[in-house]
Amino acid sequence: MKQKPEDWLNDVPDNQEDDEDDEIIWVSKSEIKRDAEALKDLGAELVDLGKNALEKIPLDDDLRAAVELAQRITREGRRRQLQLIGKLLRARDPEPIQIALDKLNNRHNQQVALFHKLEQLRDRLITEGDDVIPEILALYSHADRQQLRSLVRNAQKEKAANKPPKAARQIFQYLRELAETTN
């Protein structure tokens, strides 16, 4: 006996009915490979970190040991160790590790931006002289006007005499100290 199409739709058992909660999500093989490669790259970033930076990353003992071993290995062994680190990361939630790495990178970027700002202030101090000092005093209220003026005068003399920029380095160091005590 042949069933009409309408009949076989009604014959679906209760346990096979479509539930929106039980929706199956199909992931392509290429997407799985991309995710695995991204985790391997995350592992490579961990391996490239220094010892102090690595301590700030939340890793369990197995993963930390694998990363420390990969830091000591070279060439083909390192590649295989990176594969293992990627495998270990697939078994864990990589999000806290990625967040900690992003914080480390962001802190480094902020420090570089601060150094560029301080270098620009130093250059302006040397070229414009006393006109920039009130701006620095506004930024860093605990700055010593007299010391700044002395350093600026010395830097301008060195620049005019084509001497090495010893005073310019001292200005930068003083500005960096001011910035560190402010933060």
Curated annotation (Swiss-Prot):
InterPro entries associated with the record: DarP, DarP_sf
Name one process (GO BP) from the record.
assembly of large subunit precursor of preribosome
- Short name of any one Pfam family annotated for the protein: DarP
Where in the cell is the protein located?
Cytoplasm
Tell me where it mainly resides. Answer: cytoplasm
Matching entries from SUPFAM superfamilies are given as:
PSPTO4464-like
Region feature (Disordered) = 1-21
Does the keyword field hold rRNA-binding?
yes
* Gene Ontology cellular-component annotations: cytosol
Provide the coiled-coil residue spans: none
Q: Give this protein's Gene Ontology molecular function annotations.
A: ribosome binding; rRNA binding
Q: Which UniProt keywords apply?
A: Cytoplasm, Ribosome biogenesis, RNA-binding, rRNA-binding
Q: What does this protein do?
A: Member of a network of 50S ribosomal subunit biogenesis factors which assembles along the 30S-50S interface, preventing incorrect 23S rRNA structures from forming. Promotes peptidyl transferase center (PTC) maturation.
- What family is this? Belongs to the DarP family.
From the Swiss-Prot or TrEMBL record, give the protein name.
Dual-action ribosomal maturation protein DarP
Native organism is Pectobacterium atrosepticum (strain SCRI 1043 / ATCC BAA-672) (Erwinia carotovora subsp. atroseptica)
